[in-house]
Curated annotation (Swiss-Prot):
This is Probable ubiquitin receptor RAD23a. SMART domains: STI1, UBA, UBQ. One of its GO terms (biological process) is UV protection. It is found in: Nucleus; Cytoplasm. Residues 80-136, 202-222 are annotated as: Disordered. Residues 1-77 form the Ubiquitin-like domain. Residues 142-185, 320-360 form the UBA domain. Interacts with 'Lys-48'-linked polyubiquitin chains. Interacts with RPN10. It comes from Arabidopsis thaliana (Mouse-ear cress).
Length: 368
């Protein structure tokens, strides 16, 4: 029979199965038809009527029929079927620069976030750092797209979740649908702070937006601030960041940075891609920008000091060869967050095999 399989991105595809096929066999079927790179068997979660299906059960046992559908999503667990440092990635003939969002005008070279200090070993990095980075750099949806996503997740749950529950999970996941579904099944961790923001963006006039996703959950950059707001500021009192004080997205950024200062680097890096004019303005007014970040805000203790010494904590740049860039991409393809891959690669003296071994041995530490 033909079976429809839906994804969290709203797309769907069909596979041919037998009612007696096990869920593991269906996962293998999906891996074969959609490619191992996109849907590795070991990372798949198949959902039917709000229930995660067990590998050893069959379609008929789970009452899956041709008239129904399955939902497929990828878990963050690292398995042998989805990990391998020898996996190939498209090569690049251009020289790449790995940058940690320096407060300078962005260039056309590729840039990513690297923590400011290389003296800290990889194993000392807290798990919350990668979790917060994932929240900030993941695909975001907003406005009417959120309403559509809420409906899709409710449909996926087969009536198991109401709108309020789904909305709360999305807020906790910073509008990342895959993470939100994880929260719905496993519960929202106590360490996760649910931002008090209006998901629909109604009345704010300024929404978190992102271009259509082109890959994994970390493929779409953030658009923290609208271009027109920066243009208005530049056209008026050039050299001031006062307009950020009333910006909803900036307030959310302050809250996140207060919880974990490391998140500022990747968020500024993404900002440089989406809004280079604002990044240039921040570059010209670094002291004022840090002062705005350090100002007490509602919900804080009133004594926030994100950077004790701004000059000492500002990000830096690290150059890599095309071969090293390919190594980083292969490590990232194993399923690890890009920031963690960079940390491991540099700490292992740019040795891909050592970095891969470290990432696999400590994979449990990187999971949410």
């Amino acid at each position: 029979m033909k079976l429809t399989v839906k994804t969290l991105k709203g797309s769907h595809f069909e596979i041919r199965v037998l009612p007696t096929d096990t869920i593991m066999a269906v996962k293998k079927n999906i891996e074969d038809s959609q490619s191992k790179d996109n849907y590795p068997c070991g990372q798949q979660l198949l959902i039917h009527n709000g229930k995660v299906l067990k590998d050893e059960t069959t379609l008929v046992e789970n009452k899956v029929t041709e008239e129904g559908f399955l939902v497929v999503m990828l878990s963050k667990s690292k398995t042998a079927s989805s990990a391998g440092p020898s996996s190939t990635q498209p090569t690049s003939t251009t020289t790449s620069t790995i940058s940690s969002t320096t407060l300078a005008a962005p260039s056309t070279t590729q840039s990513i976030a690297v923590p400011a200090s290389n003296s800290t070993p990889v194993q000392e990095q807290p798990t919350a750092q990668s979790d917060t980075y994932g929240q900030a750099a993941s695909t975001l949806v907003s406005g009417s797209s959120i309403e559509q996503m809420v409906q899709q997740i409710m449909e996926m749950g087969g009536g198991s979740w109401d709108k309020e529950t789904v909305t709360r999970a999305l807020r906790a996941a910073y509008n990342n649908p895959e993470r939100a579904v994880d929260y719905l099944y496993s519960g929202i961790p106590e360490t996760v702070t649910i931002p008090a923001t209006n998901l629909s963006g109604v009345g704010s006039g300024r929404e978190l937006t992102a271009p259509p996703p082109s890959g994994g959950p970390n493929s779409s950059p953030l658009d923290l601030f609208p271009q027109e707001a920066v243009s208005d500021a530049a056209g008026g009192d050039l050299g001031t960041l006062e307009f950020l004080r009333g910006n909803d997205q900036f307030q959310q950024l302050r809250s996140m940075v207060n919880s974990n200062p490391q998140i500022l680097q990747p968020m500024l890096q993404e900002l440089g891609k989406q809004n280079p004019q604002l990044l240039r303005l921040i570059q010209e007014n670094q002291a004022e920008f840090l002062q705005l970040l350090n100002e007490p805000y509602e919900g804080s203790d009133g004594d926030v000091d994100i950077f004790d010494q701004p000059d000492q904590e500002m990000p830096h740049s690290v150059n890599v060869t095309p071969e090293e860039q390919e190594s980083i991409e292969r490590l990232e393809a194993m399923g690890f967050d890009r920031a963690i891959v960079i940390e491991a690669f540099l700490s292992c003296d740019r040795n891909e095999e050592l970095a891969a071994n470290y990432l696999l041995e400590h994979s449990a530490d990187f999971e949410d």
